[in-house]
């Protein structure tokens, strides 16, 4: 996510995240879990269920990545060559201050920004930090390309058989379209 945890130079692939999660569960002594994933975390949850099937008791996917090609233009733009040089400008204090002022102005007139716009702005603010920006770009490029998502779990839905799967989605999600939820629901038996 866009939190304050360390951003080491490491493997930011879905398989890497799934392996880190398995290592954490082993360290904590958990043998069976309900895995919950939101956005990229949904992709991690599905990768975890694929790699470490026996650990996975139930799966919850919230506005999950990895279920279709379409994603927002902003994510696709973040994969373009040079994005790592443009992101510091977008995340700069001046641009953020302008965005805050514009949001306040929009609240005065009948145009109200969607909550997702505000959330995206908060996410971009975290990219002012160079290690966070590097981790974001590496992670994004491992799952998205300019044409959309490059990884898909659709060929592995059979692995959810016998595992209760809950799919939750916001109908107005502007990052990953809700159509992915309907497609996954139709393909995942018992979801």
Question: Where are the model-predicted features located?
Answer:
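Helix-loop "lid/cap" segments that line or gate small-molecule binding pockets
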Residues: 98-115, 120-127, 139-145
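Generic structural signal for small/hydrophobic residues in well-ordered secondary structure
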Residues: 21, 25, 35, 63, ...
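Hydrolases whose catalytic domains are alpha/beta-hydrolase-1, hotdog thioesterase
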Residues: 44-48
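Active-site acidic short loop of glycosyltransferases
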Residues: 26-32, 53-54, 162-163, 189-190
């Amino acid at each position: 996510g866009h939190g304050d945890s360390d951003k080491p130079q490491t493997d930011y692939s879905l398989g890497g995240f799934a392996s880190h999660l398995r290592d954490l569960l082993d360290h904590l002594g958990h043998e069976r879990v309900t895995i919950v994933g939101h956005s990229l975390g949904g992709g991690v949850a599905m990768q975890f269920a694929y790699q470490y099937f026996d650990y996975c008791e139930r799966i919850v996917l919230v506005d999950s990545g990895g279920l279709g090609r379409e994603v927002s233009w902003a994510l696709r733009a973040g994969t373009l060559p040079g994005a790592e040089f443009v992101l510091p400008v977008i995340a700069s204090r001046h641009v953020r201050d302008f965005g805050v002022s514009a949001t306040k102005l929009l609240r005065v007139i009948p145009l109200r920004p969607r909550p997702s716009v505000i959330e995206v702005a908060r996410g971009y603010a975290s990219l002012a930090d160079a290690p966070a920006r590097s981790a974001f770009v590496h992670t994004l490029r491992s799952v998205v390309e300019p044409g959309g998502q490059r990884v898909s779990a659709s060929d592995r839905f059979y692995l959810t058989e016998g595992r209760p799967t809950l799919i939750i989605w916001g109908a107005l999600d502007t990052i990953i379209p809700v159509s992915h939820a309907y497609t996954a629901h139709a393909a995942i038996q018992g979801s």
